[in-house]
């Protein structure tokens, strides 16, 4: 067992051995307030041996998956209807989430 902290949240991990690989079935999600914060987390993960993926997902150098999710995207999806569809469609073309583009999509 190993205890660690992620973004101020205490976590507990267990080494399951080589039979248990990291996958997208598990990820950490960090909710961000703006583009600066989104960029800071994204660049810290991807810029240190990580890998970009689609729709705000990335993988760190140890193969752990992360979702860097601006709150504006979560709010747009929760709004439902056309606003959610426009935000979803915009997100589908992104790797790192572009906050300004999501805001523009919300407005239509």
Which residue ranges define each predicted feature?
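Glyoxalase I/VOC metalloenzyme domain signal
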Residues: 2-53, 59-108
């Amino acid at each position: 067992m190993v205890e660690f902290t992620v973004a101020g949240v205490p976590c507990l991990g267990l080494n399951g051995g080589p039979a248990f690989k990291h996958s997208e079935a598990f990820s950490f999600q960090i909710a961000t307030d703006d583009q600066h914060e989104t960029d800071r987390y994204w660049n810290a993960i991807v810029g240190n041996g990580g890998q970009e993926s689609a729709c705000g997902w990335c993988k760190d150098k140890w193969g752990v998956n992360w979702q860097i999710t601006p709150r504006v995207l979560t709010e747009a999806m929760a709004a439902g209807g056309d606003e959610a569809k426009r935000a979803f469609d915009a997100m589908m073309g992104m790797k790192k989430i572009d906050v300004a583009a999501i805001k523009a999509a919300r407005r239509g």
